[in-house]
Amino acid sequence: MSESWQPTLTEIALVFSRLADRVAEQEQIVLDPYVEQALRDALFHLELQIPGWEPAFDADAARAMRKASQESLDRGNEREAFGRALRGLSFAPHDPGLFYLLGSACFESGSVELALRVLCHTLWINPGHGGARADLEALSAFLDDSDDQQRAA
């Protein structure tokens, strides 16, 4: 149960739904700063909730959106994958698979910092998520390599 100042899981799901609408309306591949900040805020508030405490609002719809998001990523349409993952999160706000796809779409669209946050959130929900762990380790190794090369120059 959340404190009175904290949004409920239903309110967080509504945020994901509205963000999905906003992303669907835009033509640009680069994420809108408003969407990025709203997503950061939603992640913060979700981490104050207990994953699995409340059931998904519509697990079947979330599963369908997860599949649609993966197909969009496979086709190279990051914006569509991002929007579909957000729509899926409006049905299941603690779904690690949807967060993983959201993080992948963030990375593919150039929002590396947000991708790192979302992948970390995926691991917060499910520490055994293999894809998120592997991607996070690869990103960390790449970023560590970049820092070493910049220092050498």
Language-model-detected regions and their locations in the chain:
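Register position in tetratricopeptide repeats
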Residues: D74, E108, A141-D145
